Structures are given as C-alpha cells and as structure tokens.
C-alpha cells in the first residue's frame, strides 16, 4: 500500500559460498521464491481483513460519528446487529459508477495520450520520457513522467467547475463516498486479478515473474515484476500515482466544501490538513522521476498489495483526517495550529532534504558538497541477475550520517502533524500515524535485510559507520 519510499534496488538473498554481494546472480531478487508460514499467515490475514478495516472506519464515521468503540460495544451488548449496520450502509449506485468510471478514464487518458510539457517551462522539474532502474532481467524500462501535469489539469478542471461551470457540486465526492468505495473495490480486485492472470499467461517479461506455488501469496504479492500493456502503460507507475494520489487532494477539497456547506465556514484544522497533505502530493509528482528508483518500483511485484491498496486503502484511509473534520469541525487555538504547521513543515524539510542529499550524491558521483563538506561514503559492490558486476556508494554524510533511514523519520513527523491537526477527541484520525509507523518500520527492516544480502560485508561496514536506523540514540 502506497507510501513514501527511499531509493532501493531488487532484493537479494544471502547464499553460503557466494562472494560478497553475489546472491543476485542466483536469481534472488524481488519478493521471496518460497513462502514461510508467517508470511502466508500475514497474507491471508490482510486479504481477509484489510477490506473490512477500510469498511469499518468509513462506516464508523457514517453511522457512529467516527467512534471506533461504539459499534463494537453496540454489537457486544445486543443494541445492534451486523445486519442492521449493513442495512444502513449505502449501496453502490449508478451515479457512483458513472463518477468513478469517468474519473479513471480521465486519468488513463491524461497518462497515455498527453506527453508531458511541464518540464519545458518549470525550472528544476524532470519530466517527459525517463529511464528507470536496471530490472532483474537487465533491462531499463522507459516511462512517460507526466503525473504533475495530470494533477495540475485535473485540479484546474475541478476549480473551473466549482467557480465557473457548475457541472457538479464540489461536495460530490463526500456525498457519494461509500458508493464510490464499492466502485474502488471493484477496480482494485479487477486489476489485481488481471495482473495475476497476465503473469501466468502473457507476461511482459517472463524472466521477471515469480511463482511460489501458493495462490494466496502470488495474488497478494504479485507475479510480474513490471507488468505493462503495450510500450507505455506501466501498472506500477499508473496505479501508484493515479487514480489514488491525484484524487487525494480532490477528496480533501470535497471534504472542505462539505464542511463549508454544513457549518458555513472551513476550520483552521481542515485548512491545515489540506495544506500539509497537498505538500506531500505535490512533492510526489514533482519528484516522480525519483520515484522510479524507490522500493515500490525496484522491489515490489504488482499484485493485490499494490493494485487494491492504491485503489482503496490509500484514498480511503489516508484521507481520514479530512473525513473526521467533516463530522467534528475542530477549530484549533492559534498557537496549537502554528505548532502543528511547524511540525509538518519540519518533517517535510527533513524528508525532502534527506532524499535530495542522496539524489545529489548519486547524480554527481560524490562530486558535491553536503552541509558544506565533501561527502563521505562506503564503497559497495553487487552482481545483478544478468551476471554483471555493479558498484555503489552508500552515503554516510549529511542526514544520512544521522540515521540510515532519516527520510522515514521526517515522513513520520509529517504524518503525526496530519493527525494532531484533528485534536484529541477521537482515535480514528490517528490511525494514519500508527499505520505509517508500522509500515515504515517494516520497510526499514525489509530494506536492510535486502541490502545486507545484496552488499554482504560492505553493509556491515556501513552500519558500523551509521549505527541507528530511524531515531538517533534509540533505534
């Protein structure tokens, strides 16, 4: 399920008798070839309960004022039955299906038919046709980077409708939120199933497919590494960025419009949530080329985890703060609001500058200054699946000398700010920081396991130079 990543590479596995960093030569990349019992249990748990978790949170707001405990208490004491809760849940509607179909169609058209022009006039922005990382099969895929353009055009249409055209109400997303949930699930399951069938019958590159022999694991984690239709429609890039992340800011705007409609004003907490989350969304699309070197693209196969997660989990659970504020319009004291804003901006600064330092170091091959000094690095080497020897440098200067994943630390600070903007009245808006802490800690450990196998003894030298993962002096 989508989240901010750090530059990564295909996973490797240590094998006795192999030289340092040579495991990749044995085909150990991407997700696991074999499934242990814990991984299988985790996969089955997520397949069964992740859709229920999304439904429970949205239902709790719709029927119980965003309380997570009252529905359980009502069921436990007999004051409500599951059938009663389900009966009060809005079903899928023809209107919601039309809205969602139009939305996805628009994003596909913007992705496929409109080459990027933003890079021609925006200084510093890298768009247009770009190359990704070397794949396990030794290929270098090309991508049309036009996410920022799609975001700008989509929001231009949104504001033109709101202020000039009047084709639909700005509250249209909130007003159809649960019916749209069923549509998002249909797309999520459809694309995940199609991707699995494609991996078996007509993969883009059969050398980059993995089969464990376990249906549930293959479905969840994916079979194909880089599934594509034609030359340019890349499943990972499209579903990671569109339709979920482009929609993120539109969803928040619709929630703000609903707050205005219900109460006659928009609270400073809603403004904070819209601003802080919009900063992340814009950062994602401004740095979409950098995203090609992250874990999602360079490590994960495309399965239900990404397909359903990007269609359902991301747009519905990452926007809980705005949804909560529709039901509970919190007006924060000025000092508190400023504190939340500063926390969010500081977290973003750390997140962005940490990634910028690594990107600068890689682009210049170390011929640069970080914090006014020549950067230091640990020299590493590894072998890719095609047998070629590669050399890398692991940066140990700047923020990368503070902790090995300090970009995640900044990410968590920003995530906490989103939640703090909602005050302390309910647990529901704090789900995001809890989820992100678990997700990023898991990614941190997973990436370190992969790097330890990939770089071997060189990784030990790196961890000795930078001993902490996320929190200096603690973890």
From Swiss-Prot:
Which example biological process does GO assign this protein? cholesterol biosynthetic process
**What pathway or pathways are given for this protein in its record?**
Steroid biosynthesis; cholesterol biosynthesis
Its membrane topology is listed as: Multi-pass membrane protein
Record-level Gene Ontology MF annotations: 7-dehydrocholesterol reductase activity; cholesterol-5,6-oxide hydrolase activity; NADP binding
By its UniProt entry, which InterPro entries does this protein fall under? ERG24_DHCR-like, Sterol_reductase_CS
Catalytic reactions of this protein: cholesterol + NADP(+) = 7-dehydrocholesterol + NADPH + H(+); 7-dehydrodesmosterol + NADPH + H(+) = desmosterol + NADP(+); 5,6alpha-epoxy-5alpha-cholestan-3beta-ol + H2O = 5alpha-cholestane-3beta,5,6beta-triol; 5,6beta-epoxy-5beta-cholestan-3beta-ol + H2O = 5alpha-cholestane-3beta,5,6beta-triol
Where it mainly occurs, coarsely classed, is endoplasmic reticulum
**PTM sites of type Phosphoserine:** 14
Taken from the UniProt entry, a GO cellular component term is: nuclear outer membrane
Record's function text: Oxidoreductase that catalyzes the last step of the cholesterol synthesis pathway, which transforms cholesta-5,7-dien-3beta-ol (7-dehydrocholesterol,7-DHC) into cholesterol by reducing the C7-C8 double bond of its sterol core. Can also metabolize cholesta-5,7,24-trien-3beta-ol (7-dehydrodemosterol, 7-DHD) to desmosterol, which is then metabolized by the Delta(24)-sterol reductase (DHCR24) to cholesterol.
Give the matching PANTHER family: 7-DEHYDROCHOLESTEROL REDUCTASE (PTHR21257:SF38), DELTA(14)-STEROL REDUCTASE (PTHR21257)
Q: Which family does it belong to?
A: Belongs to the ERG4/ERG24 family.
This protein is called 7-dehydrocholesterol reductase
